[in-house]
């Protein structure tokens, strides 16, 4: 047996962005790997045939993070290309190119390209797509300009490239950087003509999007200067070319929107009792207003802290009129189902970290999950035992001695139970003294669990006791436990 090494994390691989084909035969997902020589990461799409259980890589461009199913056998994936004419003049403007891939044969071709940085795309119906893309209030899109207008804007950018004028709050975001005057804008694209057009006003920053044939539900923050914590809920109808406001933008922060028959479902944070990190209330919404179905006292996302996962996730899926979602409960994650008549019912889970999931029928579920002290893999669950479908990290920890976290729950001074964990040093000898490290998670609204955590395992392998807990302010025990308002 051997000890965990610092650089072992360079071997870890992370599956995410799970998307089932419409017929449920195939699962497409992204796999992230470390590129040590390039000082970065590689992302490629993989396909799991759920009949044979075999998985194979289907892209090799090292920058493909999401598959969009067009039908049972074809996916779209995006690549980005810098405009060569502008690059030679010292400016970087990005085209988004979508390629169409037959997952059976591997045959692929360019489907279409868009002159902007696309952040998400959804197939509405044959030949029509809804997409979101970055737009800017303080400058036009160079790729849409020509002639004197284009030359004038190029000159202005070259003249002012040494500084930024910041006029909005917040100024920046973790993992994004400065995004002053930037908006996420909703568009319609018509493949037959190559035309696209904006569906939201200039100052709308679009958040959640849910698409069905001929209609789009979305939420957005309309703002200038200071971004609010509340957002509006809207429905755009293709036949009428009309946008209806379902919830005004000054009422709720919103965790999810989806279709519920002819109405809509909204998970809104009222923020009356516990502020901006309050757990959501279920609302059924139509143009007449909202029906309050009660607050759910857990987070409707999986918020387990780990340093061994990266990628996009989907925490909610609607099948018919049942909403399936991942929550954070205790020190782990649960798959839950919500129906209007019965409310929330837990289906599967416990102390493991359920990261991402998809389902087409509400009977078979595909997960990216970290089970026990394993690294993330893809699993299938149909009501019985969890079935592991991939072994991307099977050899990485083979022969490595790990420290199993021991759960210790104690009661604090005002009678509230606090969940904690202790990891003994690898090779621990009773009676011998060891140094210790107390690890405190950030947040707010996060939670430590008993799963694999590279940094803490490395400390244990280096001869330290490691102890950590989920104090007040953590997720998994309801609003009152998580409340940090002074």
How would you label these PLM feature ranges?
Residues 4-10, 54-58, 107-112, 195-200, ...:
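A short beta-strand motif characteristic of beta-propeller blades
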Residues 12-27, 61-78, 84, 115-135, ...:
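Conserved beta-propeller blade repeats
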Residues 30-51:
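Beta-propeller domains
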Residues 32, 134, 439-443:
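Glycine-rich His-Gly loop
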Residues 37-43, 84-95, 140, 177-183, ...:
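Short, solvent-exposed loop/turn segments at conserved positions within beta-propeller repeat blades
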Residues 43, 85-95, 135-187, 279-282, ...:
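Predominantly five- to eight-bladed beta-propeller fold
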Residues 44-50, 97-104, 185-190, 231-239, ...:
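Beta-propeller blade signature
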Residues 356-363, 368-486:
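Serine-hydrolase catalytic core recognition
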């Amino acid at each position: 047996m051997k000890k965990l090494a610092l650089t072992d994390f360079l071997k870890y691989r992370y599956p995410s962005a799970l998307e089932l084909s419409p017929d449920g035969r195939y699962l497409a997902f992204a796999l992230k790997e470390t590129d040590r020589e390039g000082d970065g990461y590689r992302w490629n799409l993989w396909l799991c045939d759920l009949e044979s259980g075999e998985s194979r890589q289907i892209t090799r461009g090292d920058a493909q993070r999401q598959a969009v199913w067009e039908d049972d056998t074809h996916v779209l994936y995006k690549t980005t290309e810098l405009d060569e004419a502008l690059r030679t003049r010292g400016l970087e403007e990005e085209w988004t190119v979508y390629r169409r891939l037959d997952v059976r044969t591997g045959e692929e071709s360019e489907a279409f390209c868009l002159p902007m940085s696309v952040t998400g795309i959804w197939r509405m119906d044959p030949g029509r797509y809804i997409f979101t893309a970055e737009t800017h209030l303080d400058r036009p899109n160079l790729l849409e300009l020509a002639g004197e207008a284009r030359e004038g804007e190029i000159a202005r950018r070259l003249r002012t490239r040494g500084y930024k004028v910041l006029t909005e709050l917040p100024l920046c975001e973790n993992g994004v950087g400065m995004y002053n005057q930037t908006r996420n804008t909703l568009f319609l694209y018509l493949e037959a003509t190559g035309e696209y057009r904006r569906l939201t006003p200039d100052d709308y920053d679009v958040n959640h999007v849910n698409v069905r044939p001929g209609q789009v539900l979305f939420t957005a923050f309309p703002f200038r200067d200071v971004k609010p914590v509340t957002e509006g809920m809207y429905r755009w109808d293709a036949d009428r070319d009309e946008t209806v406001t379902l919830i005004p933008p000054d009422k709720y922060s919103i965790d999810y929107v989806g279709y519920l028959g002819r109405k809509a479902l909204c998970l809104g944070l009222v923020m009356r009792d516990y502020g901006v990190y309050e757990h959501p209330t279920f609302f059924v919404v139509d143009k007449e207003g909202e029906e309050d179905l009660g607050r759910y006292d857990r987070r409707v996302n999986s918020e387990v802290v780990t340093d061994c996962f990266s990628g996009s996730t989907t925490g909610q899926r609607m099948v018919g009129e049942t909403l399936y979602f991942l929550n954070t409960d205790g020190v782990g994650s649960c798959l839950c189902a919500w129906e209007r008549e019965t409310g929330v019912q837990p289906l599967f889970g416990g102390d493991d970290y359920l990261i991402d999931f998809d389902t087409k029928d509400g009977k078979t579920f595909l997960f990216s999950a970290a089970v026990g002290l394993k690294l993330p893999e893809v699993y299938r669950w149909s009501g019985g035992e969890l079935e592991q479908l991939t072994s991307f990290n099977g050899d990485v920890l083979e022969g490595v001695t790990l420290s199993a976290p021991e759960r210790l729950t104690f009661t604090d001074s005002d009678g509230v139970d606090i969940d904690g964990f202790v990891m003994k040093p690898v090779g621990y000898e009773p009676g011998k003294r060891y140094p210790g490290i107390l690890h405190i998670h950030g947040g707010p609204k996060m939670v430590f669990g008993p799963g694999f955590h590279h940094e803490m395992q490395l400390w244990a392998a280096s001869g330290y006791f490691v102890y950590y807990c989920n104090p007040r302010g953590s997720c998994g025990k309801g609003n009152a436990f998580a409340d940090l308002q002074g």
